[in-house]
Amino acid sequence: ACFLLAKFFADIFKASAHADTIGYVIGGGLLAAVAVVTKFSLGSILLFVLFVTHAMVGAVELGTDGWIQNITGNLFTSEQGKYLFIWTSAIMFGLRFCAHFIEHKLKISPIGLLFACAVIACVGLNLASTMTSFGMALVALGIYAVGKTFFWPTMLAVIGDRFPQTGAVAMSIMGGIGMLSAGLLGGPGLGYCKDRFAGEELKRADAALFEEYKAAAPSKLLNIESTAAVGLDGKKLGEAKDA
């Protein structure tokens, strides 16, 4: 959590030449403060694993949600992309009212539900990677939506079930970690991958065309210099599509 906060503050002060240093100093200070408050207790290893897992949930679930309309809009039409986003959101909205039925009538434990959701979401994502028609997209993204429906709330339920003594504190920390991960790793991470792989593919296929449409500044993941990759200029691509 402190690492994510450090990267968050580094992004706030990115205009400064010492943005990373400022971020790490703030993150280190927060870590030291937490260590003093908790009397340097290591805490539960399982709780730490759940926090790390929820960071991945936030990045994958909310990060994908932020990009899904653009991705499907490019595969099909912009209007169809909106319909697919509404379709997946409607499935999740409806199923979350069925959580009580699933747990008490079907007798599925929170851990069992997380496992089932992981399998279903994996199947849905693999199908989504091969979709070529709007009908196939409805099926693939519908399966993915069913899988990801209970990730976030069930992770919070596991915390409350396994660590009741933490009260709302652990749930709040877990939710914060998930949102920070989505904002720092999920959306930006997918954007970085898009820039990196689109640029590399165009450069391999047509170096001259890449030089014409490449972005002025490189993309970086978490502002790390070693991850710098030159993507494509969105404005130039938009003008080319409209031409």
Identify the residue ranges that each predicted region occupies.
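Extracytoplasmic gate region of multi-pass secondary transporters
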Residues: 2-18, 39-94, 183-196
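Hydrophobic core of transmembrane alpha-helices in multi-pass small-molecule transporters
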Residues: 55, 135-151
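Small-residue-rich segments within alpha-helical transmembrane domains of MFS-like 12-TM solute carriers
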Residues: 62, 145-153, 179, 183
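Intracellular juxtamembrane helix-capping segments at the cytosolic ends
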Residues: 64-68, 149-163, 170
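Helix-to-loop junctions at the C-terminal end of transmembrane segments
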Residues: 95-110
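Structural signature of the two symmetry-related core transmembrane helices
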Residues: 112-127, 135
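A late C-terminal transmembrane helix in Major Facilitator Superfamily
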Residues: 165-198
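Low-complexity, proline/glycine-enriched hydrophobic segments characteristic of transmembrane helices
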Residues: 188-243
